[in-house]
Each structure stands twice: as C-alpha cells, then as structure tokens.
Amino acid sequence: MAPQPLKVGTSKLSKMVKSAPKTAGKSKKRAVEQVSEESDEEFGDQGSGIDMSDDEEEVDGDDEEDEDEAFPEFDSELEDNDQEEASDEEQDEQDTSDESEIVEEDSDSESGYNTSDIERMYASDDDLSSEENKDLPVDEKLSRLIAKNTVKPDDSIGTDDKISRAKEGVGRLVPSKHVKGSFVREYDEYEAGYGSESSTEDNPNTVGNIPMEWYDDLPHIGYDVNGRKIFRPLQGDELDKFLANVEDPSAWTSAEDKLLQQNVQLSDKELDIIRRLERAENPDADFDPYQPTIEWFTGEGKERVMPLSAAPEPKRRFVPSKWEHKKIMKIVKAIREGRIIPNKPSAEKPRFYPIWSDADQHNPHVMYMPAPQLPPPKTAESYNPPEEYLPTEEEKAEWEAMDKEDRKTDFLPEKYDALRKVPGYKNLVQEKFERCLDLYLAPRTRRVKLNIDPDSLIPKLPAPKELKPFPIASTVQYRHPGDTRVRSVSTSPDGQWIASGSEDGVVRVWDLGNGREVWRWDLHAGPIQYVEWSPSREESLLVALVAGKIAVLSPLALVAPHIAAQTLTHSNTAFATSSATTKQGAGNEVKGIESVKWTRPSERERERGVLVYVEVPGTPKQVTWHRKGDYFATVASDAANKSVLIHQLSRHGSQSPFRKTPGTIQRVAFHPSKPHFFAATQRYIRLYDLAAQKLIRTLQSGVKWISSMDVHSGGDNLIIGSYDKKLAWFDMDLSAKPYKTLRYHNRALRSVAYHPTLPLFASASDDGTVHIFHCTVYTDLMQNPLIVPLKILRGHKVIDGIGVLDLRWVPGKPWLVSSGADGEVRLWCS
C-alpha cells in the first residue's frame, strides 16, 4: 500500500521544511522523497511509486525558489504561525492517533494495514522529531533534517531471493511438493471454542454437506484441512455390530458420524440433552421454566402515559367511504330490480305439526349414499315351505360337514304347521352384528345405470343366407383303413382329385365325386407329414414329405397324355443334363455341413409315378408351392439354419434363403403376385423380398405359438392360427398388429385356409369343429375388411385330444375338404 500524499499546512514535516531557509528548496523535496522511501521499506516495498528524474527535481526546486522569492512577506508570517500552531496540532494529532488506536483494537480486520496505521506511523515519527527539535534553533533543525534525509540507498532492496510471497506471521513455511522452489504455509491444528469465529463442531473431514454416496466407489471419504485424503475406516458386518452392542457397554452411547463413517462417543452433555428431549424438557439445563415474572411495563408507577403514535387523524376517518357507497348502490339497484325485497313478511308457521308432510326433509350431502337394502326373504326361509325345499338326510349331513364359508345358506329350511311353534332364531344377533359391520366398514360405490341400446353394441352384419353359397353339410367321406390318423390333405388344381397323407406312410389319391381311392404310393419312410398339389394346371405334380426326404409324385395314368408328358419333361429335364448329379447344390446352392441330394427313383417306382427324391436334413413338416409351379419351399424345424429350403424342380437345385434363421420357423408361404416370402416363427411373421434379399417388415401376432398360416389371394391380408385357440387377421396396409383377433374355438387351431377365388375362409381345431367365415376385402383402402361368421361344421371325432388336422378348399367351388385324427377325410358342400 502506497503512503498517502502529505498536505501542506497540516503535516509537521511540511512545517519543518518551511521553517528552514528558503534556499533549501531541493533539500525540502529530498526530505519528502526520503520519508516516502522509508515508508516503502517499512511496508516491504509493496508500492514502488513513480521515480522523479534529476531534471524534474531541479525544475521543482526552481519553482519553489521562485515562489519563495515572489512572496517574501509570507515567509516570516508562516514561521511565526507554524511555531504557534505546532503545539495545538501536536495535541490534536496525538488525540487522533489515540482514537485510531482504540478503533483499530476493536476492529476485526485481519488483512494488512489501513490508512489509520500509516497515519499513526507518520505521526509517531513526527512527534519524536518535534520533541527533540523543539528547543533547537532553526539552523540546527535544518542541519539535522538534511543529515537525516541524506542517506545512502539500500542496495539490498529488490534483491530478495524469496520466490514465495506467502504472508508471514501465523504458521510455518515448508517447501511446496508441487511447484519447485515455492513454499506453502502449514498451520497448526486448533480447537475451536465458543470464542472462535468457526463452528464449535469442527469436523476433520472438510468435504462439506454433500451426499456421502459419491465416495462409495473410492478408497477415501474426504479430505482434511491440509488437503490430505481421509481413508475409509474398517466397517464390520451386521454380526460385528450385534457383538459390539452386546459386549461393548459404550456402544449404546455412541452415534454414527456420516462424514467420518464411524461411531463416535457422545459426551455427557450430549447424552443429557438427549435425555431431556426424550422427557420433553428444555435441552438447556440452566433454563428455569418457573422463574418469577418481572413487571417491566406494568405495575404501580410503571404505566406508559405517552401515546405510541402522535400522528394526526387521517382524512378517511371523517370523509364518507366511496367503497361503502358502491356497496350501498349495489343493494339499492337489487331492490329496484326486485331481487331483494325489504321487510319481507316471514312465513307463518303451521299451528299443528304435519307428521306426514315431506317439507321437513333436508337435502342429503352430495357424497351421501344410502345403505343397500336387505334382500327380501325367500321361499326357503318360510316357516311352512313346500316339501321340495326341505333337505334330505344326505343333504343335511353334507351341509353340516361343510365349512361355514362354503355353505350357500346359514340355515336349513324347516317346516312348522303353525307360526306359534316356530322357535327363536339363534343366528339373529350374529346376523345383525354383521349387518352393522357392513354398514360402517364396507365401502360403498355408486353405480351409474347406463341406458344403452343392446342393438347398438352389435355390429350390423348381413344375414348368412344373403352370403350363400358356402359349405353347410358333409356329403362324401373318404375312410382310411384302420382309422389311421390323416395328417394332411390337398386338392388338385382342376378340383377333380384329393390327395391325403396318413401316418401309415401311404399317400392316397381319391376321386372327389364318389369317394373312391384311385391311386396310392407307399413310401415306406414313416408317417406322411404333408402333401401338396402343384398350382399349375398344365402339370399334375404332388409333393409328399416324410422323415428326411421329399417325394415328387404324379398319378400319370389318371391325367391326360399331354399333361403327363409335360409333367415328366419338367421333372426329368435336369437328369438329362451333364451338370445333373446325385448331389445337386453341394457346392453351389446349399452351403452347410449337410447337403441336399436330388436322386432318381428306381424303374419300378417311376412306373408307379414316383418322379424324384430329394434328401434334406431334418424332418420337413410343411411344403408350399410358388404360383408358377417350378419352386416349392419346405420347413424342417429340427434342421437348424437349414430349416427353410427353396427347391427348383426344373434344375434340381436347392438353396437356403437364410444364413441364420430368426427363431424357430413354423410356416412359410409365397406371395401370390410379388417376389415376397412370408416366414412365421412362434410369435412373429416376417416378410422378405427375395429379389432384393432384405427384410421388408415384421408383423406382431400377439399369440403364444403360431400353428398355421395362409395368405389372401390379393396379397395384402393374411390369417394365422395358434395353439392358444386364437385366429388373427392381418391387414398389412393398416398396421403391423392384427386387425382382428378371434377366439371362438375351445382348443388349439390346427389349420386355416383362404378360398382361392371366393370370399371365404375356414379354420379347423382340435375341438372337432370347422368354422366357416365370409370375408370381403375391398379395393378401397379406407374401408376395412368385412368378416361374417357363417357356419360351424361338426362331424369329425376327437381322438386322444386331437380333432381336425388339415383342410383345403376345392378350386372354383364353395366346397371344403377336411381331414381328422379319426381316419376320415370329409367333403363339405353347400
């Protein structure tokens, strides 16, 4: 802090300089500069100030000499006045310094020096010089002043080797660990008391009021006042805490310190405060709740006679209120309008109290709900009920053996010929008590009666007779020998033949009209899993699935010669080419640990219509044809990533469309008009683009396990059946979730199928029934499909919990073919 500038006329130094000879102008200037240098040295060279050059000093000295020569008459007066005022000013400055010392003692400032300190230092030096030079002549004073201010400068100023400028005084300087050559100051530990400005409960952990969970993953719990880490103390488990409470008597007088994360012992004063708080007493032991009352402002001779306020009365006290005027005018307006009738005569009270009048009934509370009425007595509660209400001995014994909670009634009906013979009811008090409990304990709810027309809740659907034709009765039955279970059935594209696959390993072809078996193939490879006719009308191809093998069949003797020739050409062309081998696709189409083999049957089998064998991994469970009749896809759930295979009959090639199957594939289907492929897993249906080889969309079925699937001829709708008795209709233009979910079967659904040309679809279930529905799909995208239930067909028997297994529509006709576990294939006609 730089020293304050010295004022001429008030500072003793200036007076002393003025008392010196006028020729000492330069010495006067040096004296002032010397005092500034001494003050700078005293304050540790904190303010360097601005140095004056010799030229400037000479100019200043010349100016002062000129001023002295210009006004010589003031010099003698100033000398005399200075001598007279010296004693008075010294006394004043002494008083001022004493007062400043008192103020500084009371001050709480802790930082450096202030202006009063500097003035006190200047005043002390001036006082000493004035006391010594009081009786000296002017020449002696001037010589002493010149000698005092003519001092050689200290060359050591500015050459301090200290790097750290830490404040000296409290604490000790130690070398810094982080900055080389620097020093930091360490302070001794102190114990805060009531006289200290800090808290009396100073904690070694200085992290403050923060959540201690921030340190859960760290080995320390905070920092002390010197910045050192406070490591986490050892923590015992619950057993250690229990043993400490049992063995350590001081454990009950300790509390957990959240900052230090350890138990600290409570002092006697703290325990005394806790005991007082438990007893609802004042925590201060020195507090006297019964100290005598000291009447400071009451009692004789202590009354206050002066008013608290002598302000004059406001104007509003004696001026009429305009707000009251507005209220009165509002009442006057209401009287004029007739809304308020003054002096209205009170109603006359009736002379006699009308006991039958309803005038005294008050309106109940808005939340009031009357108690429910007791049910009226029934015929069984009569003292003379009819004979059919009286229990038999077996019913009495059964009623007495039941628990009270399981009994329908709390009494047994009894018969008396007269009312006077009826004894007292022993459960009367118990029933009234339970009634009272229900009245004040059971919550009540108010049910709002809805007046809804029941017809408005039922959708307006056309009558089934308006939607004919559809199958209504079973006309032909195709019985299999031994009532073997028929797993699959299929109809030829011309609607003349029916193919069925049973568990005896035989594929049979039936005449649709008369029910006669016209052809059969015994594949000797276990149960027939699935059969499917090719949709091409130019050929007559049938695919049958058995364990590990696909058989391509054709009843050549039953079809026209040109159809038979086209069928043989299509299936055997690949055998005639040089590239055809018994292992088609081993290195080209199918890549995996197992290869697909296309083999030619024996000569005898070819005469019977067995055209091609395809050996595949796993057991295929479903086959579906492409609309052109050259490609067909099979599903084998137990074949891992080769569960879905797409085969081409003309080239005898097979390929797997999926490198990794997305779940267990249950059913697959080709899109009727686009190169798209549907794959249904247990819960999802995925639509793939075979040309672009990408996933288009995923449909969420909302069922637990998909069992069957079929695609509408338009391609924008599909239905699925599930083992949890649900049928879901998807409108792919609408949403990825089902448009309708129907649950009308009592057991699992086994098969669902659309009619290829008519607006019909059907579903078969293990409950032995087949449900027929009408479905109209509109070309207008703003109109939802119309679904109308038409008929429930019953005829198949349920064997071992299995009913109807498969169904197919007859092309071009409203007829349906179904197969069941009872060994029958039925034709349902309109």
Curated annotation (Swiss-Prot):
Principal localization? Answer: nucleus
The family database entries (Gene3D superfamilies) matched by this protein are listed as: YVTN repeat-like/Quinoprotein amine dehydrogenase
Instruction: Enumerate the GO terms in the molecular function aspect.
Output: large ribosomal subunit rRNA binding; ribonucleoprotein complex binding
List, alphabetically, the InterPro entries matched.
BOP1/Erb1, BOP1_N_dom, WD40/YVTN_repeat-like_dom_sf, WD40_repeat_CS, WD40_repeat_dom_sf, WD40_rpt
What parts of the sequence cross the membrane? none
Q: Report the sequence similarity comment from the record.
A: Belongs to the WD repeat BOP1/ERB1 family.
What is the protein named? Ribosome biogenesis protein ERB1
